[in-house]
Curated annotation (Swiss-Prot):
It comes from Vibrio cholerae serotype O1 (strain ATCC 39315 / El Tor Inaba N16961). GO terms for molecular function: decarboxylation-driven active transmembrane transporter activity; oxaloacetate decarboxylase activity; sodium ion transmembrane transporter activity. One of its GO terms (cellular component) is plasma membrane. It comes from the Bacteria. This is Probable oxaloacetate decarboxylase gamma chain 1. Its cofactor is Na(+). It catalyses: oxaloacetate + 2 Na(+)(in) + H(+) = pyruvate + 2 Na(+)(out) + CO2.
Length: 86
C-alpha cells in the first residue's frame, strides 16, 4: 500500500509542478505582451492615395448596338433549331 501512496504523491507533485510552470510562463507572456504593446508604437495606416481620374472617359449608352442584337438573335435561333432536331 505504501508503494501506491508514494506513486500518488509523486504524481501529485509532478502535476502541481507542471501547473506552476505553465502558470508562471503564461503570466510572464501576458506581461511581456503588455510591455511590448507600450514600447512598440502602433502602426498608423497610410493615407489613402487619391485615385487619378482616367483621361479617357467613354460615354455611357443605354442602348445595345444593332450588331449585338443581331448576333444574339442568330445564336438563339441556332440553339433552338439544334435542340428541336434532337
Amino acid at each position: 500500500m505504501t508503494h501506491i501512496g508514494s506513486l500518488l504523491l509523486d504524481a501529485a507533485t509532478l502535476m502541481v509542478t507542471g501547473m506552476a510552470v505553465v502558470f508562471l510562463f503564461l503570466t510572464l507572456l501576458v506581461y511581456l505582451v503588455q510591455f511590448m504593446s507600450r514600447v512598440i508604437p502602433q502602426e498608423v495606416p497610410e493615407a489613402a492615395a487619391t485615385p487619378k481620374k482616367s483621361q479617357k472617359v467613354q460615354p455611357v449608352t443605354d442602348s445595345v448596338s444593332p450588331q449585338v442584337v443581331a448576333a444574339i438573335a442568330a445564336a438563339v435561333h441556332q440553339h433552338r433549331s439544334a435542340t428541336a432536331k434532337q
